[in-house]
C-alpha cells in the first residue's frame, strides 16, 4: 500500500493551512451568515452505545492500526503548495536510506544496479507466460512524478507499445515489510482485481521486481475532488448531488462485492475529463463477511466513524458515515470536526453537528440519516443497504440507471488539454525528479515472501475500456 499521507514533523501544524484556506472560501448569503442550525443529536441518535459492541457480530480482522492525518492525494494536488513542499522535503529525507542494493527510476526506464528483471514475480504457481499480456518495467516510459507516499511514488507513465497513459504506483517492499503493511498491500491489489465500475479507478496491470511492487492504474487527470473544492469553496447542491450520487453508486458496488473502503475523503476521489468522480486508493480497503466486524483502527481522522474511534468494531456502515462527512464538506466547505487528532476524535464521539440554515431541508434530512452516531441506525445500514440512500428525497431528481451509465453529466468539467495533461497536479510533484530513493532487499526466503502471485493483467472487456477507448 502506498500511504496517502506525507510525513509531518510537527503534528500540531497539520490541518491549520487546510482550515485557514477553506474558511476564506465562498460564503453563504448574508441573511444566514453565522446562523447555524444546532442539532440536538441525542434526539436523533439516542444515547451513546454501551461499551460492548459484540452482541450481534463476531470481532475479526486483527490488523495494524493505520490512522492518517488530512493530507494530499497520491494522484492529485496537495492542499497548500508551500506546505506540501515542506512536507515533501521531510518525506524525501526520511526515505533516502543508506543501502547497498539500489533500484531507481531514471528517464525512460527503471534500472536495478545488481540485477535487471522485467518481471521478477516470485509466483510459484504459474509462469509469466501463463499470464496473458504480462508486462514489466521495461514496457513503460516514465514521464512525471504525480504523487508520493510512505512507501514510494506515483508516476505518470506511457506504455510503449500502445502510447496509453497510466498512473503507476511504485512501492518499496522493504518499507512495506518494515511497517507491517504487507497484508494491506496484498488486499489492495486483490480488491482492485475484483472491481469493475464506472466511478472507480481500475487496476490495469500489477507486477514486481526484487525490490518493488508496481500497480498500473487508470490515469485520471481532472484533479481530485479536494482540488476543485479548494478552488470553488463549496459546491451548489445540484452539483454536490451528482457527485454524491456517483460516490454512493461506487460505495454500493463495493459493499455488494463484500468490500469496505474505510478511507473515503476528497483526496481519494478523482475527477475525470468529463467531470465524473472516480474513487481511488484502496490501501485500507477490506473484504468482509456479513455479521462480522473489523476490529482495527484505520482511516483518516476527520472522516472516521464513531465506532472506529471507539475501537469497538466496525462494518460497512462506517463507509456511509464517511459519505455523510464528504457531503457535509462539499456543501459547507469544510468537514464538521476540526482541531488536533485527539480533539477531532472526541468531537466525533460526543459533539453535536451544526448544519447551516442555507442548506435545503432535504439535505438536512440526508445528513442526519448518514451521520447517525449509532451504526445500526445509520442510513444505508439496514437490510436494503444503499437502496434506502438512493430513495432518499434529496436524490429525487437522480435517474440512477442513467447515472450509472454515465449519461448524467455534471455541470462542471475540469480543464484538461489531453490525456497527458498534468495541469491539475501540484507542481511540487510534477517538478520533482523521477529519480527514486534507494531501496534495500526484503527477506529473500520465498516461503517468507508475502508478495507471491502478484502479477495481474486486466481482461480487455471492462467497463472503462468500453467507455474510454474512443476518447
UniProtKB/Swiss-Prot annotation:
Residues 396-466 form the AGC-kinase C-terminal domain. This is Serine/threonine-protein kinase AtPK2/AtPK19. PROSITE patterns: AGC_KINASE_CTER (PS51285), PROTEIN_KINASE_ATP (PS00107), PROTEIN_KINASE_DOM (PS50011), PROTEIN_KINASE_ST (PS00108). ATP binds at residues 146-154, 169. Interacts with TAP46. Binds to MRF1. GO terms for cellular component: nucleus. The modification Phosphoserine is found at residue 296. Downstream effector of TOR signaling pathway. May be involved in adaptation of plant to cold or high-salt conditions. Mediates the phosphorylation of MRFs (e.g. MRF1). Gene3D superfamilies: Phosphorylase Kinase, domain 1, Transferase(Phosphotransferase) domain 1. It comes from Arabidopsis thaliana (Mouse-ear cress). Undergoes serine-specific autophosphorylation. Phosphorylated at Thr-455 by TOR. Residues 281-307 are annotated as: Activation loop. One of its GO terms (molecular function) is protein kinase activity. The keyword Signal does not apply. GO terms for biological process: cellular response to hypoxia; positive regulation of translation; protein phosphorylation; response to cold; response to heat; response to salt stress. Keywords: ATP-binding, Kinase, Nucleotide-binding, Phosphoprotein, Serine/threonine-protein kinase, Transferase. Transmembrane segments: none annotated. Belongs to the protein kinase superfamily. AGC Ser/Thr protein kinase family. S6 kinase subfamily. It comes from the Eukaryota. The active site is at 263 (proton acceptor).
Amino acid at each position: 500500500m502506498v500511504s496517502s499521507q506525507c510525513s509531518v514533523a510537527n503534528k500540531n501544524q497539520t490541518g491549520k493551512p487546510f482550515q485557514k484556506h477553506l474558511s476564506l472560501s465562498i460564503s453563504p448569503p448574508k441573511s444566514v451568515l453565522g446562523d447555524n442550525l444546532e442539532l440536538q443529536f441525542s434526539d436523533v441518535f439516542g444515547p451513546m452505545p454501551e461499551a460492548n459492541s459484540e452482541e450481534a457480530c463476531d470481532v475479526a480482522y486483527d490488523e495494524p492500526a493505520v490512522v492518517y492525518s488530512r493530507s494530499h492525494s497520491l494522484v492529485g494536488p496537495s492542499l497548500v503548495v508551500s506546505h506540501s513542499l515542506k512536507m515533501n522535503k521531510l518525506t524525501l529525507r526520511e526515505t533516502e536510506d543508506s543501502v547497498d542494493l539500489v533500484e531507481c527510476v531514471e528517464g525512460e526506464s527503471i534500472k536495478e544496479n545488481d540485477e535487471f528483471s522485467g518481471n521478477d514475480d516470485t509466483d510459484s504457481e504459474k509462469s509469466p507466460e501463463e499470464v496473458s499480456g504480462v508486462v514489466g518495467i521495461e514496457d513503460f516510459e516514465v514521464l512525471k512524478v504525480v504523487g508520493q507516499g510512505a512507501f514510494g511514488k506515483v508516476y505518470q507513465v506511457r506504455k510503449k507499445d500502445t502510447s496509453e497513459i497510466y498512473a503507476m504506483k511504485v512501492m518499496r517492499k522493504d518499507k512495506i515489510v518494515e511497517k507491517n503493511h504487507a497484508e494491506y498491500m496484498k488486499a489492495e491489489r486483490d480488491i482492485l482485481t475484483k472491481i469493475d465500475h464506472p466511478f472507480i479507478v481500475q487496476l490495469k496491470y500489477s507486477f514486481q521486481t526484487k525490490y518493488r511492487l508496481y500497480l498500473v492504474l487508470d490515469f485520471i487527470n481532472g484533479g481530485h475532488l479536494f482540488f476543485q473544492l479548494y478552488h470553488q469553496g463549496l459546491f451548489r447542491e445540484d452539483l454536490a448531488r451528482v457527485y454524491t450520487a456517483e460516490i454512493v453508486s461506487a460505495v454500493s458496488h463495493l459493499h455488494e462485492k463484500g468490500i469496505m473502503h474505510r478511507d473515503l475523503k476528497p483526496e481519494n476521489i478523482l475527477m475525470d475529463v468529463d467531470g465524473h468522480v472516480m474513487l481511488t486508493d484502496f490501501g485500507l480497503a477490506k473484504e468482509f463477511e456479513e455479521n462480522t466486524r473489523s476490529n482495527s483502527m484505520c482511516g483518516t481522522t476527520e472522516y472516521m466513524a464513531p465506532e472506529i474511534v471507539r475501537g469497538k468494531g466496525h462494518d460497512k456502515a462506517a463507509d456511509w458515515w464517511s459519505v455523510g462527512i464528504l457531503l457535509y464538506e462539499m456543501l459547507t466547505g469544510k468537514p464538521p470536526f476540526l482541531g488536533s487528532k485527539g480533539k477531532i476524535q472526541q468531537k466525533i464521539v460526543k459533539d453535536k453537528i451544526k448544519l447551516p440554515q442555507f442548506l435545503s431541508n432535504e439535505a438536512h434530512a440526508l445528513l442526519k440519516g448518514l451521520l447517525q452516531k449509532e451504526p445500526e441506525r445509520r442510513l444505508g445500514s439496514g437490510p436494503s443497504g444503499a437502496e434506502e440512500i438512493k430513495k432518499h428525497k434529496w436524490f429525487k431528481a437522480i435517474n440512477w440507471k442513467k447515472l450509472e451509465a454515465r449519461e448524467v453529466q455534471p455541470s462542471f468539467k475540469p480543464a484538461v488539454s489531453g490525456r497527458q495533461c498534468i495541469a491539475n497536479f501540484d507542481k511540487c510533484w510534477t517538478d520533482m525528479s523521477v529519480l527514486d530513493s534507494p531501496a534495500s532487499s526484503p527477506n529473500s526466503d520465498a516461503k517468507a515472501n508475502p508478495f507471491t502471485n502478484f502479477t495481474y493483467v486486466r481482461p480487455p472487456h471492462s467497463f472503462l475500456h468500453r467507455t474510454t477507448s474512443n476518447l
